[in-house]
């Protein structure tokens, strides 16, 4: 295994490597097709994928490296690899970008989520619901975890998000910016039907086991 392949494996397996390199790995045709071209650092394809009509069409005009199917299986994080992966630069977002420019802020605030699949699914659903951004506590699972990336189904490229190092402080910043925050509580006296969601607002979601 060469240095490039070791680099890919480290990005697949280690959160600290993804953070240090400011990069992550995507797999499969959909994630590859939707990836912003200017953020793709490296493309790797399996021999069988390159020989397929689908692969030849997808890779036409692109610079990529070819590896054997067995090597690709080693590099892949999935049980049934699709034959194409890429290393992509992470996209940093500012706190201001969460607030939305063209419409009222509609945010999610995620506290201590631990399941990679849950985080990805939430991001995918958030995009469908029109969320303008996501604020996450620093103890949430890594958003660039391979399972999270797959679960986003491409929403990762389009929904701004910030991992907060001052979670309580940033929530206060949202409130000062005119964003109302909402969370479900068994002892609450206000029905969810009574709130005005047309104004800037944020919904809080807590840990899978312990809530907020």
Give the residues covered by each predicted segment.
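Boundary-proximal intrinsically disordered activation/regulatory segments immediately upstream
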Residues: 1-53, 140-141
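Short, hydrophobic beta-strand segments that form beta-sheet elements in well-ordered domains
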Residues: 24-26, 41-47, 66, 180-185, ...
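Glycine/small-residue-rich loop that forms an oxyanion/phosphate-binding "nest" at active or ligand-binding sites
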Residues: 59-89
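Generic beta-sheet signal
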Residues: 46, 67-68, 87, 137, ...
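RNA substrate-binding interface of SAM-dependent RNA methyltransferases
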Residues: 95, 99-188
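Short, aromatic/basic amphipathic alpha-helical patches
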Residues: 51-61
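Active-site/ligand-binding-proximal alpha/beta "capping" segment
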Residues: 182-212
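Short, hinge-like loop/turn segments at secondary-structure boundaries
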Residues: 59, 84, 151-155, 198-202
